[in-house]
C-alpha cells in the first residue's frame, strides 16, 4: 500500500498513477475502518495518515484541473 507519499512525489506522477494511488488509498481506508469496527485495528494513527494521503492526491488533481500546477507530461513539451 501507499505509505508516506509526499506532495512533491504526487506532483511528479501522471494522472493515471494518481488515480491508481487514490483507488489504493481508498481501499486501504475501507479496510482500516472495517478493522476498527471489529476491534482488530492495532495502529489507529494509520487511519489519519491514509486520510491525509487521499487529501493530498485530491489536492494535486485539483491543482492540475485549475492550471495551478502542470503535470509531468506538459513539462516535457516546454
From Swiss-Prot:
Gene Ontology MF annotations: structural constituent of ribosome
Pfam families referenced in this protein's UniProt entry, alphabetically: Ribosomal_L29
GO annotation, biological process: translation
CDD domains: Ribosomal_L29_HIP
Keywords, in A-Z order: Ribonucleoprotein, Ribosomal protein
Record field: transmembrane: none
Keyword Ribosomal protein: yes
SUPFAM superfamilies reported in the protein's UniProt record: Ribosomal protein L29 (L29p) (SSF46561)
Gene3D superfamilies found in the cross-reference section: 1.10.287.310
Record-linked InterPro entries: Ribosomal_protein_uL29, Ribosomal_uL29, Ribosomal_uL29_CS, Ribosomal_uL29_sf
Annotated Gene Ontology cellular component terms: cytosolic large ribosomal subunit
PANTHER family: 60S RIBOSOMAL PROTEIN L35/50S RIBOSOMAL PROTEIN L29 (PTHR10916), LARGE RIBOSOMAL SUBUNIT PROTEIN UL29C (PTHR10916:SF0)
Family per record: Belongs to the universal ribosomal protein uL29 family.
Protein name: Large ribosomal subunit protein uL29
Organism (species): Mycobacteroides abscessus (strain ATCC 19977 / DSM 44196 / CCUG 20993 / CIP 104536 / JCM 13569 / NCTC 13031 / TMC 1543 / L948) (Mycobacterium abscessus)
